[in-house]
């Protein structure tokens, strides 16, 4: 007697197929009517990995106002999955982004005030952050999200002392898993300061927030507020930080000679604090 063929629960099957690029999935939509129906499921389409069709950006005049720029290879003439106006937020402005999620502030009329909202522009899912005393524009409010763990996000409030030239006095951390704010006194040295514009270039990697300070060092804090660290700079002035292969990278642009500027890429490959120069290139060669 032959054994019955094992089948997967529909919920599990949808979860698996949602991780397959949609174009690859649709190559098999002629297998059967049920498969064609599955490929036409709008919810599955929204969750499937998409070919990059564009990106959000601010302007030099108003960085809080978002624009959506299409790539030439985008789906020309078709309605985009993402509405760049984010109409469900009912006004407000962009504050920060991380891993495909946006942190926006929305103005409320009753009572008058501001709500901070974390939203996924691809799915139009959004969450209002609970109010806390330090959740205000005078402080630095940042988002942490790892697409490899899409079930949760983190919000950070970098608390500044307005009477002491913006010195950092503490950090408040919100975990979407617990829906609770946790307040921590700063574990960094006194006189640690971060500009608001520098904070926009923050990095969330391996469960840790990275910030460039006014003295061009990098300070870090984990989502539990337990591990605080300062990483010395490898070069006098860093332009931006980022990650590749789960390693911290920094980019510096320095005046090279009469021919132009030199772009340098440094990488921190372990916790030793030693930087390695990976790449250098004259910017004129990239144009």
PLM features: what roles do these ranges have?
Residues 1-287:
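N-terminal entry/capping and adjacent linker segments that precede and initiate structured domains
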């Amino acid at each position: 007697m032959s054994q019955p063929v094992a089948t997967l629960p529909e919920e599990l099957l949808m979860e698996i197929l949602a991780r397959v690029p949609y174009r690859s999935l649709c190559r098999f939509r002629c297998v059967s009517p049920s498969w064609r129906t599955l490929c036409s499921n709008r919810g599955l389409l929204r969750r499937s990995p998409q070919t990059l069709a564009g990106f959000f950006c601010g302007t030099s005049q108003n960085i809080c106002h978002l624009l959506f720029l299409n790539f030439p290879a985008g789906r020309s003439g078709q309605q985009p999955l993402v509405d760049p106006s984010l109409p469900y937020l009912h006004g407000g402005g962009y504050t920060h982004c991380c891993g495909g999620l946006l942190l926006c502030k929305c103005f409320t009329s009753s009572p008058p005030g501001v709500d901070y909202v974390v939203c996924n522009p691809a799915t139009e899912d959004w969450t209002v952050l609970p109010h806390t005393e330090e959740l205000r524009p005078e402080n630095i409010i940042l988002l942490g999200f790892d697409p490899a763990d899409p079930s949760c996000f983190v919000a950070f409030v970098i608390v500044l002392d307005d009477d002491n030239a913006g010195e950092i006095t503490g950090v408040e951390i919100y975990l979407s898993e617990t829906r609770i704010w946790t307040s921590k006194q700063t574990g960094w040295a006194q006189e640690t300061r971060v500009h608001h514009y520098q904070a926009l270039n923050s990095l969330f990697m391996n469960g840790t927030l990275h910030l460039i300070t006014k003295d061009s060092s990098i300070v870090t804090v984990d989502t539990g507020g337990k591990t605080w660290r300062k990483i010395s700079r490898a070069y006098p002035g860093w332009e931006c930080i980022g990650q590749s292969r789960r390693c911290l990278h920094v980019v510096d642009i320095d005046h090279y000679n009469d021919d132009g500027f030199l772009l340098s890429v440094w990488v921190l490959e372990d916790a030793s604090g030693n930087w390695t120069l990976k790449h250098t290139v004259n910017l004129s060669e990239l144009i």
